[in-house]
Amino acid sequence: MHLYKKLLLIIVILTPTNLFAEYEININFESGFEFESQKILISDLKNSKSKKQIEKILKRQDWIKDFSIVYKPFKKEVYVSITNRKPIFVLNNQFFYDINLHKFKFDNSKRDLVIVQGPVKNEEDILEIITRIDSISSINFNLSEINYSY
């Protein structure tokens, strides 16, 4: 019985310490390290204290296309795998757009995209212009900027 009390005391002492410990988070960016937002994400995740908080932080990121999380049981180890959205163009230096026209914040970190300026009401028009120019293989043309007006 005496040994049982000692064991219970050790568990009571160690449990709160383990509950408030920070997670060791291992992140794999499957699409590469492209955005300034990824640096901010790493910083935010480093300070997270719970599994729910880690998931909330990841779900808030509009530039993430998909992610998976693996938790090591009985350890504070987390493995996160992230697939980035691949931007096609930047509209008015405010938002990236991917091939599915999903809009996410532009953070000035990726500059080798088509820069679109102007009052665009339908983003599909821009994507069609880019697609048509890229599909013409007979011309050697590098599209870097579109000044859109109608």
Description of each model-found segment:
Residues 6-15:
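Sec-dependent N-terminal signal peptides
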Residues 2, 19-51, 55-56, 60-150:
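Charged, solvent-exposed interaction patches on well-folded alpha/beta domains
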